Amino acid sequence: MANVKNFLTLFIEYLQIEKNYSKYTIVGYISSIEDFERFLHVQGIKGFEDVTYPDVRIFLTEAHEKGLTRRTISKKISALRSFYKFLLREKLVKENPFLLVSLPKQDKRIPKFLYEKELEELFEVSDLSTPLGQRNQALLEFLYATGMRVSELCSLKESDLDLFLDTVLVHGKGRKQRYIPFGSFAREALDLYLQNGRRILLLKAKEPCPFIFLNQRGGPLTPRGVRYILGELVKKTSGTLHIHPHMLRHTFATHLLNEGADLRSVQELLGHSNLSSTQVYTHVSKDMLRKTYMSHHPRAHKGK
């Protein structure tokens, strides 16, 4: 297919420089485009500029028949729609065949979150006498205290911290920045790590690393590394938890709203562009639901 590499190179530069997307978002976009490129090759379509709306429908039908989830298909549509919007802007194609495609309706699922007792146990398993244990504790406390995305956590530098006001400057999606405060537990864990564990880890580095959270070799910690660390910490707990890093973000939002925080403030803290993205967290935990019921229903208690 002609000019594919040129198209992709230009698009990647656009995502990096103009949109300021993370490398993980860009990898997802490129994967969707390459998947579409393979489809075009099988269909005998010569180039991106030759794609029509019926071709897009066939592609999406095949994706559905392969068993891809609505969420995955939506991501592919979003990536390809953005790609064609870019190509159209650069006058490399004459139309965007994905404009007429609507995103599949998503199943409304309540985000999984941790209860406070589960969190407390997780906070007790790190060995604070070791550099890695200090890092793990700071990582856990910071994810829960700020609700930031793992990619945002991994990109934090010391210059982003304001230890006088206990706030952190987070560099979010699309060049958007926001300040998030953090509490005394996160501050204590962070101080221990910065003053001890991180300094020891830096001694193992081949070159100075500006990022706050480091791997065991003194290099920058990756989101994949965070997932591994969480998995190892969970193994040390007594329960059968299955935790992914984003669950701590879900937990952050759920706990704030359950304790009375207003939706707009939580939206700001999470860095959501749309309030609808935050509203998914307005579910009520089963414990709170039961307490409310038992406190207010006239026939909740016999003999009242």
Swiss-Prot record:
Active site annotation, chain numbering: R149, K173, H246, R249, H272, Y281 (o-(3'-phospho-dna)-tyrosine intermediate)
PROSITE patterns: CB (PS51900), TYR_RECOMBINASE (PS51898)
Keyword Cell division appears in the UniProt entry: yes
Compartments (UniProt record): Cytoplasm
Domain Core-binding (CB) residues, every copy: 2-88
A GO MF label: tyrosine-based site-specific recombinase activity
Keywords: Cell cycle, Cell division, Chromosome partition, Cytoplasm, DNA integration, DNA recombination, DNA-binding
GO biological process, one term: cell division
Cited function: Site-specific tyrosine recombinase, which acts by catalyzing the cutting and rejoining of the recombining DNA molecules. The XerC-XerD complex is essential to convert dimers of the bacterial chromosome into monomers to permit their segregation at cell division. It also contributes to the segregational stability of plasmids.
Quaternary data: Forms a cyclic heterotetrameric complex composed of two molecules of XerC and two molecules of XerD.
Protein known as: Tyrosine recombinase XerC
Organism: Bacillus licheniformis (strain ATCC 14580 / DSM 13 / JCM 2505 / CCUG 7422 / NBRC 12200 / NCIMB 9375 / NCTC 10341 / NRRL NRS-1264 / Gibson 46)
